[in-house]
Amino acid sequence: MNKKIFYTVTSLIGITIIYFTVKKFFGKKAQPIGSVLFVGDSITAIESSGKPVTSTYPNIIKSELSPKGVKVDVVAQGGKRTDWILTNLKEKLKTNKYDRVYIYAGINDMFSSVSIESALQNIQKMVDLIKSKGAEPYVIIGYDAKTFMDENKLKPTSYVPTKAGMVKLKNRYIEFQNAIPNAIKGATIVGKFNIPSSMTGDAIHPTPSGQKIIAESLLKDLRMSI
């Protein structure tokens, strides 16, 4: 009889320990997001040549989250590569603290002489910096360049004077995008956005409708975290 009581009590203690252990590790409610920073290039920028750009995804997100008390900042400029973004992210984080930082970068690197490895290394440095400041790093792969970048819309430039040269750079960007999930450590990877090629005029920049798709994709997660 005593032995039965002993086993019953022992079982109850064991169940209680398991319950509180599970509750401790899985029952915690995540801290709400109170501040977000977006860093990137022209796809992310909220101004161009000193003039505001209202159609890009950070502004769409800001218009929804700011009234809810969430601080939304942006460090982005057209034509900039990952080295510039890394430098300016460092400066921003010296005087500002964020709960979450989104990185959307690399296309200007891939359409220049910067290697895939160097661009990925810069993004990893951003991730490590963000984590050291107590924020959550998110790396955005971006639209699916394979389908979004309509080769008929890719225009040669003074630096890349042929269509074949532009297609080669497009393929380099696809390779860079595909490398992100395995190359970048310690960050949440945001998968490719399904934006049709009809939502771009130059095969690089999404139209306002395309920007809305990006914003809505990110807001789905953000809404659950505020």
Protein language model regions, located:
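Serine-esterase "nucleophile elbow" of acetyl-processing enzymes
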Residues: 22-76, 90-97, 181
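Surface-exposed cleft-lining segments at the edges of enzyme active sites
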Residues: 46, 76-77, 81, 107-117, ...
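Histidine-centered active-site loop/cap adjacent to the catalytic His
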Residues: 64-65, 85, 100, 180, ...
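Residue-level recognition of beta-strand->loop/alpha-helix junctions
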Residues: 74-76, 141-142, 191
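Substrate-gating cap/lid alpha-helix
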Residues: 147-192
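A short helix->loop->beta-strand "cap" motif at the edges of active sites that frequently abuts
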Residues: 132-137
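Single-pass alpha-helical membrane anchors
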Residues: 2-26
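Oxyanion-hole/transition-state-stabilizing segment in secreted/luminal serine hydrolases
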Residues: 38, 83-120, 138, 143-147
